[in-house]
Amino acid sequence: MSNRLRKITKATIQNDLITLRVNDAGQIEHLSMKDGPNVIARPTGLFRAILKTGENWEDVVFADRQWLNVSVSGHSVLISCDKLRTRDGERGIALRLTIRLEGDRLVFESMVSNSSESTLNEWIYPCLGTIDTLSGGKPDLLYPKHLGEKIKNISEYLRGRTDRDATHEISHAYPCPLSMQWMLLEDSGTCLYLSGRDTLFYTSALRARGSKEGGVTLEMNKMAFVKPGETWECPAYLAWLYEGSWMQGAREYALWAASWRTPVTPRDWVKKMNGCFLVINRQQYGDENWPYDTLPALYDFAKAHGFDTLGLYGWYQNGHDGSRPGPKVSLSLGGEKTLKENIKKVQGKGGRVTLYFQGRLMDTGSDFYRETGRKIESKTRWGTPYYEYDDKYCHSDYLHYFSKKPFAAVCPSCEEWHELMARHADWVYSLGADAILYDHLGGMTPYPCFDESHPHLMDKPSLSHAQGRLRVHKKIREQAERSETCAYMTGNVTDAHSQFPDCLYCAGSFPGIKGTGTSLPVAGDAALGNTESPGPMIMPDLFRFTFPQTLITIRNPNPSVSRRLANFALLYGFKLEMELRNFTDKEFILDDEGNEDRLYSRQLARLRSAHGDYLLEGRFLAQEGLTNGNEQVKAALFERADGCKAAVLWNDTDEDQPVSLSLEGARWNSWASPEEEGSGIPALIKPQGAMLIYEA
């Protein structure tokens, strides 16, 4: 629509802290702090919408093609339109948008009234940009993929993304693989924080959109599915332009999350746990490596690595990822009596035992699926299940390439599944296990379910997943609480789901390229150690600082723990993990390979236990208030219950590095590494060394 048809309007709201101006096209053309520069380089459309009209699932609404009314009321900008226009015509859908100034924050609210025959499937609002710089530099994007990433020079990174499926943009779903509903631009001490305020946890997406010209726009997408005749109010969003650190944004998000997130207090033994020694007793393809009577010997291997918990996968009749969700105790592995006896033997040695169950997928060849699963599976828009495939193999190319076992994802809104998960938890506890490990319940793809016979909240496909899963968590937690010591663990990390388990496994984070922390997929200068090169870097601090009391293991599908992985886990407060998954791993452990790694892992576990008030039960503070004069040495703070702080250091290089660390008020006079300890603060930290600096 040409500008000559618009009523020219400039809507400005401001106070002593923030100025915002919206033009007649509904674009934010000015956003600044008091006396600061305008961070909007080129205004962009404030919203988009994706409609389903007839058989067209991409009937797109662009903000700059609408006839908008823009006005000011007090400290709010009001934007409205009575009809939406797409390239195919006019739709009877009305919008009412509000941008409200609250102190130094901006609150974005919106309402959609649908009197058309279309369904508004996706509502993309707000779109904040285009931003070239916040304070003269090249902004980095802090993005909550898994535990967190920092994407250096996000504008240049997006400019270089020319692949067909993600041209000049990144976008992922929440909840999972995104762990939180906030992201942040950081530029030389200036931050722009954008956060969702969605306590229903709609299936959503967070996008950073660039272009071949550069710049970045931050966007939020809510999968709304607003049907004909429905009026829908979108959960609010909050934007905050401020001077300071990303940690202020994290604290703001944590404060809001405290209004709905009530995490359990983990069992004492889980808090003090150093690591999980995972074993697949029987594989999907039928190979049996570890009968039940080998559990005490397996625990001895675990102790040799400094681990205190034995986690059993594939302990049931059909093997790991064999028959989901209804396994039986394996007769060929020894039967129920032998399983119970050997669990007790491990516990008699001071160990703990967890038993694995699948919490989300159903084997399409199982009796359960044929009798019940078809009714409760999550359905696509075509009415078919959401299929996933899994292959397990060791030496066989056939199993690797041509034996993908199909599974159907359950719709977690179905009560039948809640009851089944609770019964399975009861059964596992009756076998004498200390914990049940329910796979996938902490996250995984939040599929919208289109089976209208299921009891989805508000009849929304996008509320079928998270809302149903929250009820599953509560059911399982009820079973665990019947005992004073039984624990509940699950995989994957999200803010919504991490409040129920005692511990999460499979952190989705790893050390990255040595000396840089750069993610492995990044090539070019980043792979050579140039950390200024555009691209993603691992930043587990993002989730760990926001929710420091959440206990997490570091995913490690290998039969040993490398020195770098152990140091990485120490730095970020992850519990260790390793896995024996096939016959090759069995040979590795029986042949006594990996001696150096095993010794170091055991020494590191002793260090953690000796200083467990910091390293196992303390609060992770990232680098808050810490001055580190050597960026080659990674550092993080931990706070124990009495408020004292200690620092963990890791030299992820191949050379000695000087230690230059200070914290106001700290009286550090001692240090300890996995191999040795001493007084004072050492001048150097050795290559691939880690240490704790603390007050004795």
Q: Which sequence ranges carry the predicted segments?
A:
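Polysaccharide-binding surfaces and accessory modules of carbohydrate-active proteins
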Residues: 8-11, 18, 31-33, 38-86, ...
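Conserved, mostly hydrophobic/aromatic
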Residues: 17, 110, 229, 302, ...
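Conserved structural scaffold segments of CAZyme catalytic domains across common CAZy folds
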Residues: 83-85, 89, 118-126, 148-370, ...
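Polysaccharide-binding and catalytic clefts of secreted carbohydrate-active enzymes
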Residues: 165-171, 178-179, 185-190, 198, ...
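Solvent-exposed beta-strand/loop surfaces of large extracellular or lumenal domains
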Residues: 202-216, 669-684
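Active-site-proximal substrate-binding groove within the catalytic cores of carbohydrate-active enzymes
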Residues: 229-230, 234, 467-674, 689
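Active-site-adjacent "subsite" loops/lids of carbohydrate-active enzymes
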Residues: 287, 291, 338, 352-431, ...
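C-terminal beta-strand-rich structural cap/linker in extracellular carbohydrate-active enzymes
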Residues: 678-696
